[in-house]
Each structure stands twice: as structure tokens, then as C-alpha cells.
Amino acid sequence: MSSRHPSPAPRLDPAKFRDPRVTARGEPRAAVALGGLRTLWFNTGTLCNITCRSCYIESSPTNDALVYLTAAEVAGYLDEAEAAGEPLVEIGFTGGEPFMNRDLPAMLADVLARPARYRAIVLTNAMAPLRQKARALLDLRDRFGTDRLILRVSLDHYEAAHHDLERGEGSFAKALDGLVWLAREGFTVHVAGRAAFGGEDESTLRAGFAELFARHMIPIDAADPVALMLFPEMDAGADVPEITEACWGILGKRPDSVMCASSRMVVKRKGADRPVVVACTLLPYDPQFELGATLAEASRPVPLNHPHCARFCVLGGGACSR
């Protein structure tokens, strides 16, 4: 019988991920060039209505390390991208819980109203903050339709017990209630789960989610890897190989398949005068991935100098958007 709580992985060799240019073995470290900005993420703030046991960004009701962005700040970056002719397709909002930011509806309206017809995606737990913005969401639906507004709801597992273990007792029922409401109101909904959670393989997880969606009349195809994203586990302290320049050929992967080849994220640190641009949604705190205050400054290549670069993006094939 497979274990639902596997043995801990070997811990990371402290000699790894020290130098952005070379690995612990002295081999040239892989770096990823920005091939064109197709997805721009905004971290709306790290405050969240719940505290999750394994949150990679440590969001909680008290963590305001990344403060709320304003609609004007978001508009400034969108204006910069458009003036530079960036091939933007998708604008993402993450947190924390984005619906705790009172400016989120205005941000979404700005994105959806622009002539470029961007797609907007919001990562949400679909709990109380979303329901408190229900009227604003319905107004956005009525103004802009639902084709270009995607709500991706976090459900760690298709069973309440596993989800609640991470997010608190009763959180699964509340998230599911929000997901059902969104589906009933005609919004485009996706779900984000965890690929290795519960000790099950991917086919079992997708079958479990498919049954859940069918039972609650949620129009999500559980076989679609975009509509149901199953993310690799992230443990920055677990051992993982470093990615060298030679790894692309060995693994049969291309640098342009990695998130930082086509995306950046805007954050605003507590006490800062203005936002900054970081290389990756997963690494908002690490100073080596802070690239500058503008999108132009943030266009330089990104050395893959963090365990998440290897485990999540290159080896795990993860991406926050497709």
C-alpha cells in the first residue's frame, strides 16, 4: 500500500545553488533568457484569510511582507509593456489571497478593458474574500463576459481530509462552495491541485477530481492539464540536482519551456516606495531574483540558482500558466 506521507527526501547539499554562474561541481549553470514577455504576474499582497501548512510564500492573516499593490501601480506596468511592444497575452494575479485587495476588481476591469484583449487569471482559495467581492465579480462578468477571465481555485486534493490537513478544518467545504458558485454563475473556472499529495499517481488524482467535478456539476475536464493543474511539491530544503547548460540536451528540454523565459512578476515590499519586478512567482523574497523596478530592467537572463528552478520548473515541468 502506498504511503500518504512518504519518508522525507534527503536534505540539500549546502554547496549547491551558491554561485549564479557555476554549480557546486564547477559546471556552467543554466540561465534562461527572456524570449518575450507573454505573461505578467502581479502579487497583490501576501495577506491571506488562512494560514496553510506548506505555503511556499508563507501567506497568512498577518504576513504583509508584500503589501497591497494599487490599481494605479498595475496600470503603470501594463502601460510600460504596451509601449515596449511586449507580446503580452495573459495577466495573472496571485497572493496571498488576491480578493483581499480592495483594488482587485479595478485591476481586472483595467486588464479586460484594454484593446489588446488580454486574458486575466486570478489564483484564489474561493473562500470568504471572494464571496465578499461577488457583486464586483458579477459586474465584471456582465461587462466583459467570461472567456477572458479565469478563476483558478486551489483544491489540494479531491478529498476534504487531505485539503483540510493543509489549509484548516472546514476549508475544503468553503472552497468547494465558492467553486460551485463560480461555476453556477458561468465563470470560467480551473483548479490547482498537488501532484504528489496523498501518495497517489496522477491518473488516480485526476479520476478523483473528475468524480468530484461531476458530482457538483462543475464544468472542468479533469484530463485537461491546464484546467486541472497538478503542481509538483516544493521543498527548498530537499536535495535536487543543479541544472547545468548541458542539462538541456540531456533532459531533452528547451530553455524557452521554463516560466522565466516568458513571464515576470511585480511585487511591492513592505516599506518600499515602489514595486519591483522579480523573475518568478515562486521566488518573491530571494534578492538574487529581484531584477529591477521596471519591466525593461527585468528583461535580463535568469540563472537557475534555486532548488525551485530545478525541482518545479525544469524537472517537474511546472508552470503557473500555459
Language model features with spans:
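Short, flexible loop/turn motifs enriched in small residues
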Residues: C48, T146-D147, V258
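Accessory C-terminal segments flanking Radical SAM cores
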Residues: P232-R322
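Conserved alpha-helical substructure of the radical SAM core
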Residues: P8-G95, F99-R114
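Conserved C-terminal portion of the radical SAM core fold
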Residues: V89-I91, R119, G145-L155, G170-V240
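Short, P/G- and charge-enriched loop/turn segments at secondary-structure junctions
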Residues: P28-A30, L140, G249-R254
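Canonical radical SAM enzyme core domain
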Residues: T62-D79, P98-F144, L151, L155-D177, ...
